[in-house]
Amino acid sequence: MTEEPYFYHPLENIEDIEVFEDAMERKRLTPKLNEARPYVYFTLEYYDKDNGIRGGGGLGVLAADTRRVAERMQLPFVTVTPFYPVEMHQRLAACEELGGGQSLLDSEATQNVAVSVAPIDEERRVNYADFGFSYVDSVFIKCCGNLCKLDVIEKRFKTTRILAITEPNFGSLYQGLSGSDHRLYQEVALGFGGYQALKLVSLRPAIIQLNEVATFFAALARLDELCKNGMDFYEAMVYVRKHTLYTNHTLVQAAEAEFSHEQFERFVYPNVRSKAVRRWLDGQFTDSEIRLSSVATLLAELKNGVSKLHAAKANYQDANGERVKFKAVTNGIDVFKWVAPQILTFYQKCGIIDSIGCVSANYREALENLTAEKIRELKHGGREIMNQILENYPDQNGKILEFNTDDFVFDFKRRFVDYKRPELAFQDPARLRGVLEPYGAHYILTGRIHAGDENMVQKLQQILAAVERDDYLKTHVHYLADYDEKLAFGLSCGCNTAINVPIVGLEACGTSWEKDVANLQLLISTADGGVADLPREYHLDVTGSSDAEEAESLYARMGEALEIWGNDFDLEYRIGTQLEGFLPIISGARMVKDYLDMTGLTATK
């Protein structure tokens, strides 16, 4: 009988261990990145509309910014993420869609919280081929007794690439509740499927950065392969730990969902081939439940929080009960993506930032060119950008907004979750009116509500009811339903003052405020997240020991912002102070450099 011909397949590559002995001895990684051994960034959230992936909020935007910054820095860098075949959009429901017969905000209905209005999610299918992705091959994972096929697709740039896994039923980001079967399936598919995808294209990571705990299974897949192919478990653990960076964005471990051992039996263990890894993982359960962060910290020697306050306050324990120490690497943004073109040109011409987005050595002196007259001129250009974008975003009354250059506009734009407090400005509607009306000022409110978050739906209903009851607020407070990166950009460019009021101690970093500061908005904020990297004098600080006190502080700060914009000296001083303090923090290139310094990696030319 003739022997079947042998066909080599890239998946037969195993993780090489040629540098293992060296890795055992040194504290830092191989100091060079190259095309075959790139920096690899796993993320379940990735928000990059230009490339067809609309997955997530701030964390997803951060992931996309990180790749763009790496491209500008000419780093060999690979983002591994799902390509979601479905993207979600949100709009305000018309009353008849909810089964009611009253007007959208009927005057009698507004006396009751249960007004006939709520955000509705709409699905839109997305085809990866429409965004320049090409099909590579398929890989398989095992779940619930089934062999699940995942298509591997990629899009290459000069030095970076997006390597994605996808399948028609993958769903949208975070489809299902935390701890649900579908959520676990998505995480397992990204981890085990994404690791196979790297092998498929013959890439061997110099470092794997886990962008939040949902990507834990990538490190587990690497550990499993090393053990399955003959490496001693403890040696493999050392190797994986020295080549893994875990980035945490959540302050309180108790807020993280748990998965059961029974779920792992169906979704995880069918993909684990090493008995040693299986035995180790079994030992990490407590009362048949597991939090992925407790094991992610064991697989990553390098761990960071995303602001100074977050790194200091994050309350995490590993599976051994030991307090986890995080290094601070504050999130940054891609200034070339998020700063209005005319402002960016000014920064570059004056020598405030360099070609990759880092501040120059003499940026403080260069900021002296930013006069009040120049600020107003640049913001007028930003207002034009905002008005063009707003043509596609009607407010709660179906009105298309257009603002004059002299109109004063506050904005609150961020994901609608309880701790970010979109309702704080509406604690006292009469007081809010008293702040806005003398200046004819407007207030824009926008942010996505997660499906099933009835608490935030109710808070939105309360806000809209309060707005409708007041004849000034109903024409000057505007809720925009379908919050996305385009709208976020427009508002950052064109609004005067940004409002950022998370409960202190609950915001890991936040990046919306960074975009606002870079676009010459005044920042009103509590001292939380990345804002707290600097003392309180660098922003208009909201304080208080209760919501009522903080609301009153917010109103006072809003009044102060209105006065500042009317005084050239104060405007120049305040905007200059913000930029002097925050520009180095805001820089995404600074953030990437911090990660390279943390890992000891540099790029070969």
Predicted feature residues:
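Catalytic cores of carbohydrate-active enzymes across secretory and cytosolic contexts
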Residues: 1-605
